[in-house]
């Protein structure tokens, strides 16, 4: 009789073991599917872990705490970015008109991380701009991209003789082995058109020159030769660490970073743009999130004997949801990322529905007026620093929200209007013939 309960218990154990075995098999299948189809897990993947784009490094450098605050310290040190004061003599004496005012505005709104080699701006007319067209999930532009393009456009307006080189890093996509040539070419053209729509809207004509790495390297022996020599000398360890290249990546994955680096060499363009001699210095303006992509430019400058590039790094824009990473266009979720392809109605809906509010107390209007709004937590307040171009208006909005004089809904509406105004430029612009801007034509 005593053995029966044990026997019964043994049967239960067998049942449990079978159940556990089934669960393990189930989990194994899930894990296998997850590995085979990484895109299916994108919803739970925090922004900043862009595995398919090759941009995994920033997520390990820029830590995001529970409140959504980003710590820039490690990135600033790693990329040699130093703080810039609004009265910096190098900026004030720069021959690039309007640069001091633009940077002062960014500094006052606390959205500029700093710069590297800014002493090269002092009394220097021989500057050219490079903007890299980075591939991601969308042909549409995200707010972080529009913000950078707006800074560049402001400089071009003040300096119509300033040359802007747009480099299309299409070879990066080929190195992943997931796209065919025609797919990448079409994708590049469509995204480039959106970039050009924003930059060329208005009456002023700018000196904009475009090239794609794949096409240029086939047609210009000098480009291919410079990069080939550089690849032989660059530190393999540094290259793989910066771009997080692993043993699983194809050999071609070590190529595209070297082509990106060589784009800062002015002599590369002299044949097509005669004024860009070796005396010129490249200026790159981008989010600090993307600054890892330009670090090899310093290695290339030393090896190939041209001027080291100047970097100006802006802060990272948080996502609408506030606490899960970066408003980065890579593998992002359409419903919480602001894109130029959004119609006015859907753009407003995204902002009103998903942007985190900085309300205090119990969330009622009464408590909001009593305790004021949290301008640090509120996403609309954060975004206004990037999209409101009038400093007085920006300060007024922040002050009123902090005092509870502007509601969460009202500050969201103000932010929506600013973003929509910028996006409308792309949305409402006429089609642009991108081929007109290539300085080396395809036959």
Task: Place the predicted regions along the sequence by residue.
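Short, well-ordered alpha-helical segments
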Residues: 189, 291-295, 409, 413
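Intrinsically disordered, low-complexity coil segments
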Residues: 178-179, 200-205, 217-218, 273-279, ...
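N-terminal Rossmann-like or analogous alpha/beta NTP/dinucleotide-binding catalytic cores
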Residues: 39-40, 45-269, 298, 428-431
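Non-catalytic terminal extensions that flank enzyme cores
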Residues: 1-139, 159, 281-282, 298-371, ...
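Positively charged, phosphate-engaging catalytic surfaces used for nucleic-acid and nucleotide handling
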Residues: 207-339, 343, 347, 378
């Amino acid at each position: 009789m005593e053995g029966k309960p044990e026997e019964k218990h043994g049967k239960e154990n067998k049942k449990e073991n079978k159940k556990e075995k089934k669960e393990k098999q189930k989990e194994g299948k899930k894990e296998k599917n997850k590995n085979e189809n990484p895109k299916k897990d994108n919803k739970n993947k925090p922004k900043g872990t862009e595995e398919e784009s090759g941009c995994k490094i920033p997520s390990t450098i820029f830590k995001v705490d529970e409140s959504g605050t980003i710590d820039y310290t490690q990135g600033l040190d790693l990329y040699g970015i130093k703080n810039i004061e609004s009265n910096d003599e190098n900026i004030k004496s720069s021959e690039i008109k309007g640069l001091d005012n633009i940077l002062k505005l960014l500094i006052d709104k606390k959205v500029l991380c700093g710069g590297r080699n800014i002493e090269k701006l002092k009394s220097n007319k021989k500057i050219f701009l490079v903007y890299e067209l980075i591939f991601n999930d969308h042909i549409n532009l995200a707010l972080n991209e529009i913000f950078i393009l707006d800074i560049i456009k402001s400089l071009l307006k003040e300096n119509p003789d300033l040359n802007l080189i747009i480099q299309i890093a299409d070879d990066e996509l080929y190195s992943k082995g997931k796209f065919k040539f025609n797919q990448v070419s079409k994708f590049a053209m469509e995204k480039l058109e959106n970039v050009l729509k924003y930059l060329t809207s208005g009456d002023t004509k700018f000196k904009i020159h475009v090239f794609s790495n794949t096409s240029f390297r086939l047609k210009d022996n000098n480009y291919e030769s410079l990069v080939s020599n550089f690849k032989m000398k660059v530190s393999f360890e540094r290259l793989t660490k910066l771009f997080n290249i692993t043993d699983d990546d194809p050999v071609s994955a070590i190529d595209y970073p070297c082509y990106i680096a060589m784009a800062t060499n002015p002599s590369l363009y002299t044949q097509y743009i005669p004024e860009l001699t070796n005396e010129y210095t490249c200026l790159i303006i981008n989010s600090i999130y993307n600054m890892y992509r330009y670090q090899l430019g310093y290695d290339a400058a030393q090896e190939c004997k041209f001027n080291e590039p100047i970097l100006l790094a802006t802060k990272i824009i948080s996502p609408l949801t506030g606490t899960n990473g970066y408003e980065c266009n890579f593998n992002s979720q359409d419903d919480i990322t602001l894109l130029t392809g959004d119609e006015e109605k859907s753009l407003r809906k995204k902002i009103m529905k998903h942007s985190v509010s900085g309300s205090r107390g119990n969330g009622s209007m009464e408590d909001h007026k009593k305790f004021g709004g949290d301008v640090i937590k509120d996403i609309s307040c954060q975004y206004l620093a990037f999209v409101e171009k009038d400093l007085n208006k920006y300060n007024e909005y922040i002050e009123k929200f902090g005092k509870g004089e502007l509601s969460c809904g009202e500050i969201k509406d103000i932010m929506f209007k600013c973003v929509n105004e910028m996006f409308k430029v792309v949305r409402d612009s006429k089609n642009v013939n991108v081929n007109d801007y290539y300085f080396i034509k395809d036959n």
